[in-house]
C-alpha cells in the first residue's frame, strides 16, 4: 500500500463538496479514503481503478490527476457520478 495525499471533487452538478486528506492506494489501484458521516460515524470510502485512470502531472514529481466514473444504484435507478481526482504519493 502506498500512502497518498488526495483531493476528490464531483465533476457535474452544483456540488462544491470536496473530499481531501490522507489515504492509501492499494495494490489493485483502489484509493481508500477515511471519512466521517454527518452523524459522526467513521467509514472508509473506496474509489476503484484510480491508478489506471490517473496520469502524472507534467512538471510535478509523484503527482497524479484524472477522472473516475462510478455507478450507484438508487431506488432501482443506475446513477453515474464522475469524480476529478488528484493525489500525491508520500
Model-derived features with residue positions:
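Compositionally biased, intrinsically disordered low-complexity regions used as flexible
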Residues: 1-2, 57
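A short beta-strand micro-motif
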Residues: 3-11
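Acidic, low-complexity, intrinsically disordered interaction modules
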Residues: 25-82
